[in-house]
Amino acid sequence: MSGVAEPVLSFAIARNAIMDSCSLKSSGFSQWLLLGLLLVFTLVWFSNLEYRKLANPDEGRYAEIPREMVLSGDWVTPRLNDLKYFEKPPLQYWATAAAFRVFGESHWAARWWPATTSFGCVLLMFWAGRRLFGGEIGLAAAAALGGCTGFVINAHVNTLDAGLAAFLTVGLLGFLLAQRPGATPTENRNWMLVVWAAMALAVVSKGLIGVVLPGAVLAIYLLIERDWRLLTRLHFGKGLALFLLIAVPWFVAVSLANDEFARFFFIHEHFARFLTKVHHREGAWWYFIPILLFGAMPWLPFIAVQLRDGWRREGEPGTLQSRRLLLIWAAFIFLFFSVSGSKLPSYILPVFPALALFAAMEMQRMAPATLSHIAWGLAATGGVLLLVVLVGGARIAHMFSKESSPFEIVRNVVPWIGASIFVFTAGAVVAAWSFRRHGRSVGIVALALGSLGAGILALGGYDELSRLSSSYSLVREIEARQGPFDRTLPFYSVQMYDQTLPFYLKRPVTLVQYIDEFALGLDAEPDKGIQRVEDWKKRWAALDQGYAILSPSNYEQIAAGGLPMRVLARDPRRVIVSRR
């Protein structure tokens, strides 16, 4: 029942929001048809949160920290593998831990926060876009965001970036609503307070980036526009007080409980992460270009045209230049992370809501015949890709196969990719036909639903790799044969750490000659790790019974030395053994 509760509740909230808003007669949708589409969107959006196993590294990490919070009752000091872990603030940990307490530990409860905050982001795009630019653009922007490949994929993966992007989007849209021409003083004040609160929640989601990004965008906008009167409409006094009230308490509490927190969090996790390669997540200067191009699909053709025209001045002098602000937002965030010493694909997620608005504006400007031509082009591209997968899927799978990713596993992804491309192509065909027969909005929604369905299927395909990316199957295989692991016995993780293992074992493991992100935690509690493999071997040999996980190559090397180990289960990347 718990897996059903979330989409039902989300749909009910969304339904009330839409029924309270205006009808969209001009878009070709009645309220009831719109609600029907919303129901379909909701069901598809939340359909596979439970189905997929948690994947390394982020999904395991950000499920295990909340699990340990619930177990320990300590909601101030985050712990990973029972070691202090200060890399990120706790908002998502709290939300996930709350879901675990109410509904129990499950895949969907681990993923509910990114999925739900992103879902809310789509609904907000509909409501705010309608108020800012008109009903049809509001619907088109929501559809574009809900069917944006990069946004959809990140919304369904348990990382912190989806929640961060959602709060930054609330701040961006709130700012546009607060400063729009015609906003009353009361509206300006209330929406600016929403902006300050959203920035605070972004900070408690992922750190100072939650205020650095919007602050820098505003500074650049002011320097370009020289609209200094805008500063008088930011409500610094009340806004800053609200920001501090939301953002500061946890930082104070965790600092009082842990002397080492402030230096590690603010220096190591912010300045060192941006300026150096200490986190080993470096990439070339062009790292985010293919991610942006792929992530913006299928709306890239519309975005490209609008970006070209987005710098044009609109309205009276002294009024907010919304399109310029959106362009600065997208460009700055993209460039900021491109020059950073730490790069991951999800870092540019906050760019996509702004791009969705650009796509919506351009689609409302284009003639239906032009939209139809573009949709046919997308359908043709999908058809070619589908043909490539059907004809050469096995060869493609061989290209991505290696010893640690065997062909026998990788090939199982191919049917899912084929189904994903087929659904996208079908959506594009329906959109191309609808643009001519039923107008813009019907075609846009068809294209969005096709893209959303394609993204969900692609994620399902990734789950075929779970024997490589997750310890779920290994743990379940062993437990099916011998029952649950005895939690009173030691479990060692030798020169490796699988982020998903503690979550599925429901217990921490003892790290052997492994530090990585646990340096701070092991410095604080060195007795929870073993520094050298040789020391572990002596301890292992003296045991009556215990468990360990090793890489296959490490296992072969140690087993060749005569250390007694019995293989319980293995896959291409992990071997779990017992002492006897």
Please annotate each region the language model reported:
Residues 20-24, 193-197, 306-580:
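Membrane-embedded architecture of ER/inner-membrane glycosylation machinery
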Residues 7:
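Cationic, low-complexity basic patches in intrinsically disordered or flexible, solvent-exposed regions
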Residues 11-13, 18-372, 502:
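Membrane-integral, polyisoprenol-dependent glycosyltransferases
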